[in-house]
Amino acid sequence: VSMFVENSRHYGLDSPDANTEWAALVPSEDGVIHIGPEKTPFLPAIFHQLKCLDIIRQAYLTEGTDGNNSLPRHCLNYLRQSLLCRPDLRLEPVVDPFGPHAVQPYGRRTCQDWRVVYK
């Protein structure tokens, strides 16, 4: 999938449509899928990541702003678009579907070597 990363009038911090647009990024039931004969629940990591970004957005709003929210808006949109461009599709086991920490997101991952950017 080809995606052009750019500033967007969508997915704002506190625009009239912000809550609806951010909520639409995560499918119903928070994106949990059930696999195998025992219907074991998993959450694709991208939905966990996008939900976390929305939580950060909402927390920022409750703390108030200094009147200049262009940088947080830029950062949220940049991270959102980056996640959509290269999503982590690893499945995270659901440990408590009704708890505040519903999934076990930690563990071994095969990742690109990010250290090369520091060389």
Please state what every model-predicted region is.
Residues 1-119:
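Low-complexity, small/polar and acidic-rich linker and loop segments
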